[in-house]
Amino acid sequence: MKHTIKVIISEKELDIRVRELGEEITKKYKNSKNKIILIALLRGSFVFIADLCRRIKIEHEIDFMTTSSYGRGMISTGDVKIIKDLDEDIYNKNVLIVEDIIDSGKTLSKVLGILKLRNPKSLSICTLLDKPECREVNINIDFVGFSIPDEFMVGYGIDYAQSYRYLPYIGKVIFKK
């Protein structure tokens, strides 16, 4: 489908906000005696976590989880499957889930349930982009980069049909008729 990309959040705005998020996260966890582990939900959050982890000024670990709720189609089945599980044990650690974008929150809510069973000391969420008007479940997001309207976004790791992850900014996809 033909489309164009309109810049919504510039590379400079992303850099400034990621730096601020790093400072907020550092402040929250700097006095904790328990380790902090950042968990990136792949694939979309890989660029965000790469930049964010360098802005957090306390010792931390990083791990990755890949989930799927789409089966073979483009509509979520609601059944969350873990494609790649964590390598690290999160028992008694401060866990910070790092997301690229949160809309309905259904998949994230199920991931939270799975991780809670592993008894972390704390479980928090950081997202680059939040679409609060799309929320279908009640979840508390501790750190939000940008609240955005319900529009299709790409760039900075977020894709459209596996394209546009490389863009250094967040852009809105405008479909042409």
Swiss-Prot record:
Homotetramer. InterPro entries: HGPRT, Hxn_phspho_trans, PRibTrfase_dom, PRTase-like. NCBIfam families: HGPRTase (TIGR01203). Its main location: cytoplasm. Its EC number is 2.4.2.8. Purine salvage pathway enzyme which catalyzes the transfer of the ribosyl-5-phosphate group from 5-phospho-alpha-D-ribose 1-diphosphate (PRPP) to the N9 position of hypoxanthine to yield IMP (inosine 5'-monophosphate). To a lesser extent, can also act on guanine leading to GMP, but shows a highly less efficient activity with xanthine. Its cofactor is Mg(2+). Belongs to the purine/pyrimidine phosphoribosyltransferase family. One of its GO terms (cellular component) is cytosol. The keyword Heme does not apply. It comes from the Bacteria. It is an enzyme of class 2 (transferase). The keyword Transferase applies. Diphosphate binds at residues 43-44, 165. Pfam families: Pribosyltran. It is found in: Cytoplasm. GO terms for biological process: GMP salvage; guanine salvage; hypoxanthine metabolic process; IMP salvage; purine ribonucleoside salvage. Gene3D superfamilies: 3.40.50.2020. It catalyses: IMP + diphosphate = hypoxanthine + 5-phospho-alpha-D-ribose 1-diphosphate; GMP + diphosphate = guanine + 5-phospho-alpha-D-ribose 1-diphosphate. This is Hypoxanthine phosphoribosyltransferase. It comes from Buchnera aphidicola subsp. Schizaphis graminum (strain Sg). GO terms for molecular function: guanine phosphoribosyltransferase activity; hypoxanthine phosphoribosyltransferase activity; magnesium ion binding; nucleotide binding. Mg(2+) binds at residues 99-100.
